[in-house]
Amino acid sequence: MHALIIINRAGSLIFQREFGSSPTALTPNEYLVLAGTIHGVHAISTQISPLPGSSGIQLLEAGTFNMHILQTHTGMKFVLFTEKKTTNARLQLQKFYELYSDYVLKNPFYTLEMPIKCQLFDEQLKRYIDSH
C-alpha cells in the first residue's frame, strides 16, 4: 500500500495517510487537488456509463500502481493506492471503512464531513497496516 485518502461527499479531502517512505510523496496541496479530481471523475463516470445505476470508477490501473475506490452508501470515498500486484485491496478498503465507522463516526467529538483528527482511528489504522 502506498496511501489512503478519504473524500467526503462534497469532494473535500478529510483524511490522508501515506504508508512507508516514498520519494514521490505528494504535498498537502497536491492531495487536495487529487481528491477534487477523483471526486469529479468519479461523478462523471457514473453519468457516462452505458449501464444505469453505475457505481462509478472502482479501479484505475496506472503503469506503476493501482487506485482502488470504495464509495459508501453515504457518498464517502475511500481511495487506496497500491502496488500493481496487490490482490486484496477491496477487503482492505472494507476494513478501513469499518475502522472509520467504529472509531470516527462513534466519536462524540467528531463533526461529520470535517477533517478526521481521531487518535483511536489513527492507532487502529496503524495497527492494521502493520499487521498486513
From Swiss-Prot:
Transmembrane segments: none
Protein species of origin: Schizosaccharomyces pombe (strain 972 / ATCC 24843)
GO BP: any one term: macroautophagy
Keyword Transmembrane helix in annotation: no
One protein family per Pfam: Sybindin
Name of the protein in question: Transport protein particle subunit trs23
Compartment list: Golgi apparatus, cis-Golgi network; Endoplasmic reticulum; Cytoplasm; Nucleus
Subunit structure: Part of the multisubunit TRAPP (transport protein particle) complex composed of bet3, bet5, trs20, trs23, trs31, trs33, trs65, trs85, trs120 and trs130.
Keyword Cell division belongs to the record: no
Gene: trs23
